[in-house]
A protein has these predicted regions:
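Catalytic cores of enzymes
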Residues: 1-203
Length: 203
């Protein structure tokens, strides 16, 4: 997990800390190994190294979508932006799931809707089998809730399949996101702009 609640020169997003702490507790309870980079240690170099050695990645940070030069779209870390171009260049063997808990990570260009190259599509191109992303800005209140419920859904499979203990099974990632979004929808009622943006790409 990579969390950046206080990115230099950008607004604070304290909800990322709450989000990551909740997910870490879920993983600990299921004895799933993980690594968390937060704050000053969440640098571009550390981030890409982390991605090369782990099958799943969770970004909880600001992101910048560059519609003119999509490969320059980036995740904003402590010392700068981790660009999509740099991620795609890497050999991410075993890449499985990427959860992009940042704003507008699947926003393309409305003039080229069938040729969209956004952060989510780029992560698929980099080798990830599945990507959870957002179509527009998300609430710092609701984002952590959706993420926590998503991982709780994934980990609930371990209870049904004991042999999956100590492993984060991503086979039903799309279904887990569906349930977590439906839970938020029931809570918010007609506030569609808050629950619609969460999407799953890939397998």
């Amino acid at each position: 997990m990579i969390s950046q609640p206080e990115t230099p020169n950008l607004p604070c997003i304290p909800g990322t800390t709450k989000e990551v702490l909740a997910i870490m507790q879920l993983l600990k309870n299921n004895e799933v190994q993980f690594l968390c980079l937060e704050g000053e240690i969440a640098t571009v170099a550390q981030g890409i190294t982390y991605m090369e050695s782990h099958s799943c990645i969770h970004f909880a940070c600001h992101a910048h979508q560059n519609t003119q030069e999509p490969l320059k779209s980036e995740f904003m870390l402590h010392d700068g932006g981790l660009e999509l171009a740099d991620i795609i260049k890497r050999k991410l063997e075993g890449a499985d799931l990427a959860y992009l808990s940042a704003c507008q990570t699947s926003t393309g260009d409305e003039k080229l809707s069938e040729e969209a190259v956004h952060l989510a599509a780029g992560m698929l191109a980099a080798g990830y089998c599945g990507v959870v992303a957002t179509m527009w800005s998300i609430s710092d209140r609701h984002g952590p809730q959706v993420a926590e419920d998503f991982y709780a859904g994934l980990l609930s499979q371990n209870l049904e399949e004991p042999e999956q203990m100590h492993v984060l099974s991503t086979d039903n990632a799309a279904l887990a996101l569906h349930y977590s979004v439906q839970k938020l929808r029931k809570q918010l009622g007609d506030s569609a702009l808050d629950w619609i943006p969460y999407v799953h790409f890939g397998l």
